[in-house]
Amino acid sequence: MIFYFSGTGNSKWIANQLSKEQKEELVFIPDALKDRTFEFCLREDEKIGFVFPIYSWAPPAIVLNFIRQLSLKGYKRQYLFFVCSCGDDTGLTQQVLEKALSHKGWKCYAGFSVTMPNNYVLLPGFDVDKKELEEKKLADAIPTVNQINASISRREELFLCHEGSIPFIKTRIINPLFNRFQMSPENFYTTDACIGCKRCEKSCPVGNIMMVGRKPVWGMDCTSCLACYHVCPQHAVQYGKRTKDKGQYFNPN
């Protein structure tokens, strides 16, 4: 069973590759939260996976919230792993996730990171990758995920996460500030280029966008995944002045 969260599609692509190879069921975390489905029954030979993007050098708050409520019936120390997608590095994501899992009495046997195209654009200096780098990351991700699949099939116990520089500062100091101050949807708006196509509404993984007339309106249950911004065909979705002249990215697969 593979639990996953994805906004712009990088982690969804990874989760799909793992599900096909491991023949494990996929569970989209926002759907489980919406339906309040927190209890899952495990086979004795089940592989349990968590797949998610890195948000400010840690797992997204929505993933940690789900784990707190999750109940795994029939858990007998089955092989449990995680795979995270990141634009550059993961910080102390492994520590954060292992702590959340240990509070449930679950052991994490393996963890991996996959470098994927950047999509965070809400801070100065942050933008999507240039097209050449984007294409290289997507190409390199294929053999990386193949290797991860092979390790999972062998139930290997190993952690291959690229922590990067100053991981403590990034995860323990910057991430809490991100969760406190950068999760608000209040600055989202659409320019006159909006054509009312509803793609932003349909792409929101938590159903936080409603169309009022022909314009999207954001609620307060935002994960800051930026799917709405990146999926807009008119580049009409903006976030204050922070997204001016910045690019868009949505996983092509």
Residue ranges of predicted features:
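Generic structural motif recognizing short loop/turn segments at the entrances and edges of beta-strands
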Residues: Q22-K23, S184-E186, R214
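Active-site-proximal loop/hinge segments that shape catalytic or ion-binding/gating pockets
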Residues: Y249-P252
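A mid-sequence, solvent-exposed acidic-amphipathic segment
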Residues: G164-G196, K202
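Iron-sulfur cluster-binding cysteine motifs and their immediate structural context
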Residues: Y189-T190, I195-V217, T223, A227-K244
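Short acidic active-site motifs
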Residues: R36-F38
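FMN-binding flavodoxin-like domain, especially the glycine-rich phosphate-binding loop
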Residues: I2, S6-L33, L42-F52, S56-L177, ...
